């Protein structure tokens, strides 16, 4: 009788646990956002772009000391032998990919990490150029491919969205070109199953492609977001929004 009771109890607990797990793992229909919904209006589309802004690595705060003067003669920290500034002096140019000491590459990089003093104080260490660049270039290409879905928007709103996307596609390529020279310029949405066989371009070829995107962005973006209908909703807080001056500045710096 005791064994029978234990067996029945075990079966009951097992069935309850199984049904509980099944309910927990079931995906709610409302949790999947369709492309039509994600890109239909300015607010939704801008939310998609915000993550690209968030991914920009802070080169001054990505480590406990700055790391910007690689290959120069200045000594910024006599004890910082593992830092890239010293590693470049030693000729160890590949240390950026292994020592986890700079903004060019960090393991554990997370596009969704946001810094707040009371939450994740290490979020500033979770943004780095190499992994985020490819992630954001893909996001920009997805956005550009879905511009036609932006149907509930004014002409001004459409230009703001498109301008930011073209700028960021060029900017992430430009940032990598400074350190790696020519590389494939990704201007389409690549399939997850597609073989990566794009040719490596020369620096000049990459710069030419980036210039087209920077020029497009400059033509679409305003000088001052505060003077736009959309920008008036966040007046005084638009200083870091990508604008025409930034696009033209990088267009010139690109060469």
Residue locations for each model-derived region?
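TPR/Sel1-like alpha-solenoid repeat signature
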Residues: 166, 248-254
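Long, intrinsically disordered, low-complexity segments
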Residues: 24, 53, 79-85, 133-136, ...
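Short, well-structured active-site flanking segments
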Residues: 177-189
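Bacterial Sec-dependent N-terminal signal peptides
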Residues: 1-30
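Short, surface-exposed recognition loops and adjoining beta-strand edges that mediate ligand/DNA contacts
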Residues: 36, 59-87, 186-188, 222-247
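Short clusters of hydrophobic/aromatic residues that line enzyme substrate/ligand-binding pockets
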Residues: 25, 33, 38-39, 115, ...
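Conserved, well-structured interaction surfaces
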Residues: 42, 46, 54-60, 88-180, ...
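Membrane-proximal, proline-rich intrinsically disordered regions
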Residues: 21-78
């Amino acid at each position: 009788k005791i064994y029978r009771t234990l067996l029945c109890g075990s079966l009951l607990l097992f069935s309850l646990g199984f049904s509980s797990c099944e309910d927990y793992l079931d995906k709610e229909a409302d949790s999947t956002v369709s492309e039509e919904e994600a890109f239909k209006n300015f607010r939704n589309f801008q939310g998609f772009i915000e993550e690209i802004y968030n991914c920009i690595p802070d080169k001054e705060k990505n480590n406990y000391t700055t790391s910007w003067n690689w290959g120069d003669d200045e000594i910024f920290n006599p004890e910082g032998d593992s830092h890239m500034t010293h590693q470049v002096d030693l000729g160890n140019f590949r240390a950026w990919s292994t020592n986890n000491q700079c903004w060019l590459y960090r393991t554990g990089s997370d596009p969704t990490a946001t810094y707040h003093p009371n939450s994740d104080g290490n979020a500033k260490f979770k943004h780095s150029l190499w992994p985020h660049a490819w992630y954001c270039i893909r996001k920009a290409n997805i956005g550009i491919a879905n511009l036609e879905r932006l149907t509930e928007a004014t002409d001004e709103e459409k230009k703001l969205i498109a301008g930011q996307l073209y700028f960021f596609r060029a900017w992430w390529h430009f940032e990598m070109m400074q350190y790696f020279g020519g590389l494939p310029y990704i201007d389409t949405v690549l399939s997850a199953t597609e073989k990566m066989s794009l040719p490596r371009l020369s620096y000049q070829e990459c710069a030419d492609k980036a210039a087209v995107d920077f020029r497009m962005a400059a033509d679409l973006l305003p000088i001052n977001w505060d003077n736009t209908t959309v920008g008036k909703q966040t007046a005084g807080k638009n200083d870091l929004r990508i604008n025409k001056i930034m696009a033209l500045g990088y267009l010139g710096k690109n060469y």
